[in-house]
């Protein structure tokens, strides 16, 4: 598998759509993965919501805790809310466990449409938010 992340930012909705395709085995893999995110996020220039497709994201168990720590740090300032989606049961289980360890949201939706609806609900529930 080629390690990459595909980004598509909907500026009017302030939603970053990502397609994660990465086999994360080492701390170096985690750092490289989040460096891709940091590079793209630096081009956005505003706080945003994110919908992530996780079917091709593999996080090996022995690196999951470090992944969670870095994920929390990497997104704490700019991310307004996150909804993940995927159909692959192994990817869903692995990411849910990792998110729980990192004390991050761990809901994973079955489709992109469900994830977008979850973001819209988060937007509506955010006090004073027009985002």
Predicted regions and their residues:
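Amphipathic, Lys/Arg-enriched alpha-helical "gate/interface" segment within cytosolic domains
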Residues: 1-131
């Amino acid at each position: 598998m080629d390690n990459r992340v595909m980004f598509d930012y909907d500026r009017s909705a302030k939603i970053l759509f990502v397609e994660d395709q990465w086999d994360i085995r080492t701390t170096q893999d985690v750092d490289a993965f989040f460096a891709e995110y940091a590079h793209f996020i630096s081009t956005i220039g505003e706080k945003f919501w994110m919908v992530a497709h996780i079917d091709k994201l593999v996080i090996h168990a022995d690196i999951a805790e470090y992944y969670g720590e870095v994920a929390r740090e990497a997104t704490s300032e700019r991310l307004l809310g996150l909804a993940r989606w995927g159909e692959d049961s192994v990817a869903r289980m692995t990411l849910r466990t990792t998110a729980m360890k990192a004390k991050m949201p761990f809901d994973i939706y079955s489709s992109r449409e469900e994830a977008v609806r979850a973001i819209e609900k988060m937007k509506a529930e955010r006090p004073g938010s027009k985002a």
